[in-house]
């Protein structure tokens, strides 16, 4: 059984026992988290939400918080001696899916 959840403005396909990296959530490592925006539940009898499946939830445990690899942007203007270098590291939360309740 799998489900498609919405969190942080993105959709993720998850299964029980799977680790998924989502946009940063304001919870500590080791805490439980529940996703109630489930748009699809697959299995023997698939359920499609309009826009979400009523009563369906996905529960998981936060494993860790972290930062992704640095992304560097570099702007350059030829013959002007003008350049700008910026870096960014996107925060994420690693969640291990415990159960899909549909």
From Swiss-Prot:
GO terms for molecular function: rRNA binding; structural constituent of ribosome. GO terms for cellular component: cytoplasm; ribonucleoprotein complex; ribosome. Keywords: Ribonucleoprotein, Ribosomal protein, RNA-binding, rRNA-binding. The gene is rplU. GO terms for biological process: translation. This is Large ribosomal subunit protein bL21. HAMAP family: Ribosomal_bL21. The keyword Cell cycle does not apply. Part of the 50S ribosomal subunit. Contacts protein L20. InterPro entries: bL21-like, bL21-like_sf, Ribosomal_bL21, Ribosomal_bL21_CS. PANTHER family: 50S RIBOSOMAL PROTEIN L21, LARGE RIBOSOMAL SUBUNIT PROTEIN BL21M. SUPFAM superfamilies: L21p-like. Belongs to the bacterial ribosomal protein bL21 family. This protein binds to 23S rRNA in the presence of protein L20.
């Amino acid at each position: 059984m799998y489900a498609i959840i919405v969190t942080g403005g993105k959709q993720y396909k998850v299964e029980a026992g799977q680790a998924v990296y989502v946009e940063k959530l304001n919870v500590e490592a080791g805490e439980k988290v529940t996703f109630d925006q489930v748009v699809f539940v697959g299995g023997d009898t698939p359920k499609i939400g309009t826009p979400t499946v009523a009563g369906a939830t996905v529960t998981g445990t936060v494993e860790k918080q972290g930062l992704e690899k640095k992304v560097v942007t570099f702007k350059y203007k030829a013959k002007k001696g003008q350049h700008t270098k910026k870096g960014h590291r996107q925060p994420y939360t690693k969640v291990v899916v415990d159960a899909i309740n549909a």
